[in-house]
Amino acid sequence: MYAVIKTGGKQYRVAAGENIKVEQIAADVGQEIVIDQVLAVGNGAELKVGTPLVSGASVKATVVAHGKRDKVHIFKMRRRKHYQKRQGHRQQFTELHIGAIAV
C-alpha cells in the first residue's frame, strides 16, 4: 500500500517502512507524528484520489533525525565591472520513518 502525502509545500509518494527526507518539521527525534494531508492512496489494484484530500486517511511517521542537505553554491558576477559575489545555502530537513497508512 502506498500514499501520496503533502508536507512542507511538496508532495511525496510513501509506503510503509520507508525513510524519506522532508522539509524541516518542528518535532523532536523519536516523536511520532500524524500526517493527515493525504492526496491519494493506492494498493496496486485500486487507487483512491482525493478532491483535494482523501477523507479519513492519515499516515503515521516517526522522526528519525534532523540535518542539513548538501550545500548549494550561488555565484553572481557582472562582467567588466569587477563585481563578484559568492554565497552558499544548506536547506534543513527532517528524516521520517513511515509507519502505518490508515484509510
UniProtKB/Swiss-Prot annotation:
The keyword Ribosomal protein applies. Keywords: Ribonucleoprotein, Ribosomal protein, RNA-binding, rRNA-binding. Disulfide bonds: none annotated. GO terms for molecular function: rRNA binding; structural constituent of ribosome. The keyword rRNA-binding applies. One of its GO terms (cellular component) is ribosome. GO terms for biological process: translation. Signal peptide: none annotated. Pfam families: Ribosomal_L21p (PF00829). This protein binds to 23S rRNA in the presence of protein L20. Belongs to the bacterial ribosomal protein bL21 family. Part of the 50S ribosomal subunit. Contacts protein L20. This is Large ribosomal subunit protein bL21. It comes from Verminephrobacter eiseniae (strain EF01-2).
